[in-house]
Structures are given as structure tokens and as C-alpha cells.
Amino acid sequence: MASSRRGLLLLLMLLTAHPGPSEAQHWSHGWYPGGKRALSSAQDPQNALRPPAGSPAQATYGLPSDALAHLEDSMPWEGRTMAWWSLRRKRYLAQTLLTAAREPRPVPPSSNKV
């Protein structure tokens, strides 16, 4: 009876005690945000050949090849599409409001008919 209680208590402690989220990145996420790997990068960045010390390439070795890419190139196509459509909606709304403000408002029919 005591061993079953001890086992149940141990099981309960194991189920409730959680070490927290892992700081490691899952292999499917890649090295860069969005889960993409640069095509020019080696499969294992630790074993990549480094340029000689003192060369200009040594200073930029730690940067990914697309670190200075334009926003459109670095954004996934889903994000680009969503940003484009929200921009078009905002532009359409602003245009509609501006043209509605310029047009004269129709005079409502009077209810004082004799």
C-alpha cells in the first residue's frame, strides 16, 4: 500500500513539475527567422571555412548572406500579400472618405408638404 502511494505521488510530481520551455531551436526552423536557410550557407555553419584573419571578409563572416536584404525580399510571400492587401484597403478607405467629403450632400426632402 505504501509503495503504491509513493508511486502515485512520484507520478503526480512528474506530471505537474515542468522544466519550462526549451531554449533550443527545433531542427525544422532553420537558422534564420521564418525557418529559412540561406542557399549560400553551408549545411553546418560550425564547419564552414573561415576567411583569413585581417581580411575584410573576416569582419562580415558572422553576418548571414541576406542580412542586408530588402524588406520585400526577406518577408515571406504570405506576409507580403497580407501587407499589400491591408495597404490597398487603407488606400481605398482613404480615397472613399476623401471623395465623399468633396461631394455635396443631397438635401433631405422636407416633411412640411402642404
Swiss-Prot record:
Glycine amide PTM sites in chain numbering: G34
GO molecular function: gonadotropin hormone-releasing hormone activity; gonadotropin-releasing hormone receptor binding
Primary location group: secreted
Annotated Pfam families: GnRH
Record's signal peptide: 1-24
Gene Ontology CC: extracellular space
Subcellular location: Secreted
Disordered: annotated segments: 35-59
Superkingdom of source: Eukaryota
Annotated InterPro entries: GnRH, Gonadoliberin
Keyword entries, A-Z: Amidation, Cleavage on pair of basic residues, Hormone, Secreted, Signal
rRNA processing recorded as keyword: no
Stated role: Stimulates the secretion of gonadotropins; it stimulates the secretion of both luteinizing and follicle-stimulating hormones.
Matching PANTHER family: GONADOLIBERIN (PTHR10522), PROGONADOLIBERIN-2 (PTHR10522:SF6)
Entry's family note: Belongs to the GnRH family.
The protein, known as: Progonadoliberin-2
Species: Macaca mulatta
Gene from which the chain derives: GNRH2
